UniProtKB/Swiss-Prot annotation:
Protein's UniProt name: Lipoyl synthase
Protein keywords: 4Fe-4S, Cytoplasm, Iron, Iron-sulfur, Metal-binding, S-adenosyl-L-methionine, Transferase
A GO molecular-function annotation: lipoate synthase activity
Residues annotated for [4Fe-4S] cluster 1 binding in this entry: C59, C64, C70, S298
Cofactor(s) essential for the protein: [4Fe-4S] cluster
Lineage: Bacteria, Pseudomonadati, Pseudomonadota, Alphaproteobacteria, Hyphomicrobiales
Family: Belongs to the radical SAM superfamily. Lipoyl synthase family.
GO cellular component, as recorded: cytoplasm
Gene name for this UniProt entry: lipA
Domain of life, source organism: Bacteria
Amino acid sequence: MVTVLDTVSKPRPRHPEKAHRPDQEVLRKPDWIRVKAPTSRGYLETREIVKTNKLVTVCEEAGCPNIGECWDKKHATFMIMGEICTRACAFCNVATGIPGPLDPNEPANVAKAVREMGLNHVVITSVDRDDLNDGGAQHFADVIQAIRAATPQTTIEILTPDFLRKDGALELVVAAKPDVFNHNLETVPSKYLTVRPGARYFHSIRLLQRVKEIDPSIFTKSGIMVGLGEERNEVLQLMDDLRSADVDFITIGQYLQPTKKHHPVKKFVTPEEFKSYETIAYTKGFLMASSSPLTRSSHHAGEDFERLRAAREARLSLAKTA
């Protein structure tokens, strides 16, 4: 099927690859998912810093429901390597297409923004860049090094793509020594073909495992969305897969459908069900688990890092006395 797009009289569509898909019903959100519109002074100041430094945030691009809360506290997740992704995941609101060249000034601009915002902890993520030989690994490393030079006290968390078929890319990123390496599985393996078709579930598991093999001191983290049609037992098996890769921290949040062209929400998981997942995650051995309707990978990342570090120290102390 060929989709003809008019880009002369109309601007380029955000998701051209989804234009031919039938509209999906967008379900009304339950009361426990409602959030206030962002209008605070802190939010506006953060937005101005982002704009002045010509930066992209996943908060805006992915339509995160927590943007008002996070930006009010001067927390933001910077999205490097542009705003155009080479993948076309069925759940994601980030634009798909052919990205432009990397901005050589971006590492310095990100570091400047981190300093201006006075961040104790920063999260750096990116679009997928399958067009680059290293998937953008060296650019990740450059950003980490620029932040270290500008604000040595800032702890750094990265949320990376999978670097599929990019030999040596992971090693480049790990060598830059981020404090937290996050790579999201996004969903259970049975949903990959329809939800995350460009990725491979067990490649992502192996990626996380390799981080620990290369540098055991780096915290590892992964997140999923629920409400995509997965079964409960599949979520529990996914937890086991992550623990087999020695992943420290799991996040579980509700999938929210960005547009009628995206994958539909199959279920709004209740707060009680989320709490149950969190309890089970701790029994399976995760150092930390965050599970709630509005949980996102970077939500409360700074506070969570302190708790994560304390949990590791407590576990090590317990092991010494045993």
